[in-house]
Amino acid sequence: MKTAFNRRTVILAAALGAGTTLLQACGGGDDEPQRNIVELAKNTPELSILVEAVVAADLAATLSTGTLTVFAPTNAAFAALLTELGVSKEALLANKPLLTAVLTYHVLGSTVARADVPLGKAITPVSGGFFKIESNNGLKITDGRNRVSTITATDIQASNGVVHLVDRVLLPADKDIVATASALPDFSILVEAVVAAGLASTLQGTGPFTVFAPTNAAFAALLTELGVSKADLLANTALLTKVLTYHVVPARVLKAEVPVNTAITTVQGQSFTVNSSLVITDQNMRTSSIVATDVFTSNGVIHAVDKVILPK
């Protein structure tokens, strides 16, 4: 009699296309010992590069024990990564620090089945950092560099955990809040303000922080509201510091984790609220809309807002 595991592998093979055989030679007896994650990968042709990488990074023993969840990139995912990074497979496998950082970013220190995935919330792998998974025409992972990967197969059982297949290698964040904002043209005035207020080093620190980041249009509207020039605003470091720190929360808060209609305390000390439509009400009862969410950084997350919020 075929095992339930064998039935699953047939389904997964069909999902990945005709001619691709996942988890070959799984055996047919109900009493056959279940393979661990590394053994499972070794018997899966589509994971052969992953196995090479695990061996090169000296992670085989680690992934053979414990209780783990592995988001396993397929060979096609690794091929795409090599093109993206502009390196050969040999060069990647020889870079043990990078390889270790990337591979451990795909591993959770507990078993998380498909049904238990905390959708939209921060997921912390054993490497540190975070990513999120959302249900959007399938399960999508957004990694630390805001790249998106699709989970193509789920709940492949191993003796020491579970494996989910992904079609793109996940990469941990490599830019802090200031560097991330600096790379986005719509935050250029915000970056000028952060530098002028002497807050750059703080927002480059460990964190984590959540920044409700005003766009350039938001700053332009503020200048009109206050009747000052940009130069005047940037020169008023006391006001700048008070206003900017009111946009920073000393914790990582993703969109799905924002407490609705509950006071959110900022680094500045005062609070604001966010309603279910992602509209912020500040201390002066002025409102601002969150227009983009969950821009990930190495030390937190950025949400863009269309109006500068003001403390009392």
What do the PLM-derived regions correspond to, one by one?
Residues 2-6, 12, 16-19, 23-312:
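Mature, structured domains of secreted/extracytosolic soluble proteins
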